[in-house]
């Protein structure tokens, strides 16, 4: 839905920019303002009160969304031998080592998440400049550098998402599809916000959640009250 289209403008008029919505209200409104032509993704954008330039204020983490994302993630795994077999059995979409690294160096990036066994990380480091900026670099803090590749694959396929603050102190993550019931979207939102709050750096001073906006990929932004995370039923 183009921002200049009549449909988008009509959808935007439904959003009261002078107020903050509860998570459940925002979920309902996201569904109402989404294009009916496709099952749009519902996203959350958060402005944090941190300085990402400081190492002790880096915010990152993972969360298993209780209702998944509505999309089956494509997972790449860097592993060999038994670990490679375990990854394939768990449903990994592509598994390899040097061959996979060469493929990525050649431009292949048809996956949503990457996992590596610890022994592969020295090799994977060769493509850090490719994977890092895209949020695809395996990292022990997000559980994507692990000897238990089968569990990591299953977690991601089951709706596990990663979040990481960018250089502008923003976080972006998915909480589902517009076809989800609003209560499921609100529960996914609450689970994700819990983890974001848990990841607050001790050195962060002042207001941590400065601004929260929920939107679909085809709809307008909906401002959400940052102080409310878990009102899953109608007020």
Swiss-Prot record:
GO cellular component: large ribosomal subunit
Pfam families, sorted: Ribosomal_L1
An example Gene Ontology biological process: translation
Disulfide feature: none
Matches recorded under InterPro entries: Ribosom_uL1_bac-type (IPR005878), Ribosomal_uL1 (IPR002143), Ribosomal_uL1-like (IPR023674), Ribosomal_uL1/biogenesis (IPR028364), Ribosomal_uL1_3-a/b-sand (IPR016095), Ribosomal_uL1_CS (IPR023673)
Keywords recorded for this protein, A-Z: Repressor, Ribonucleoprotein, Ribosomal protein, RNA-binding, rRNA-binding, Translation regulation, tRNA-binding
Record-level Gene Ontology MF annotations: rRNA binding; structural constituent of ribosome; tRNA binding
PROSITE patterns: RIBOSOMAL_L1 (PS01199)
Stretches of the chain forming a coiled coil according to its record: none
Quaternary data: Part of the 50S ribosomal subunit.
Protein role: Binds directly to 23S rRNA. The L1 stalk is quite mobile in the ribosome, and is involved in E site tRNA release. Protein L1 is also a translational repressor protein, it controls the translation of the L11 operon by binding to its mRNA.
Family, per entry: Belongs to the universal ribosomal protein uL1 family.
Full protein name: Large ribosomal subunit protein uL1
